[in-house]
Curated annotation (Swiss-Prot):
Transit peptide: 1-39
Pfam families xrefs: PP-binding (PF00550)
Job of this protein: Carrier of the growing fatty acid chain in fatty acid biosynthesis. May be involved in the synthesis of short and medium chain fatty acids. Accessory and non-catalytic subunit of the mitochondrial membrane respiratory chain NADH dehydrogenase (Complex I), which functions in the transfer of electrons from NADH to the respiratory chain.
InterPro entries documented for this protein: ACP, ACP-like_sf, PP-bd_ACP
Designated name of the protein: Acyl carrier protein 3, mitochondrial
Recorded name of the encoding gene: MTACP2
Length: 131
């Protein structure tokens, strides 16, 4: 998978429009990058829904998907007919959108938008505590 990813990075441009991550100011006056503002407390207040909607919108923008078929549980391979190269491009777009890195072994296990949102949410508190 690493070879495929490297090859894609060298030869292909993604046709997914990704909005830049904005800096958000928290109550202490410090600025932080958007997604890292989510905590487990925010998840209880709808943070997962926000992440899920961002993931779904990103998948809908991918030019090889039928927007009407993209749902939380639509399987990337079975329902959306994405092959391994398409999925690799999609994972790269998700990494860029959320400013995270998804290891290849984890990326292989992400089969739908819901899995991606759950993974992002599970990784966010770890990233926030490292900063």
């Amino acid at each position: 998978m690493h070879c495929i990813r490297s090859s894609i990075l060298q030869h292909l441009r993604l046709r997914v429009s990704v909005r830049p991550t904005s800096l958000l100011q928290n109550e202490n006056g410090f600025k932080s990058i958007g997604i890292f503002n989510f905590t487990s407390e925010a998840a209880a207040d709808g943070g997962q829904d926000q992440i899920l909607s961002r993931v779904i919108e990103l998948v809908k923008k991918y030019d090889k998907t039928n927007t009407s078929e993209v749902t939380e549980r639509a399987d990337f391979q079975k329902d959306l007919s994405l092959d391994s190269l398409d999925k690799t491009e999609l994972v790269m777009a998700i990494e860029e959108e959320f400013s995270i890195e998804i290891p290849d072994e984890k990326a292989d296990k992400l089969t739908c938008c819901g899995d991606v949102a759950t993974y992002i949410l599970s990784e966010t508190p770890t990233k926030a505590s490292e900063s």
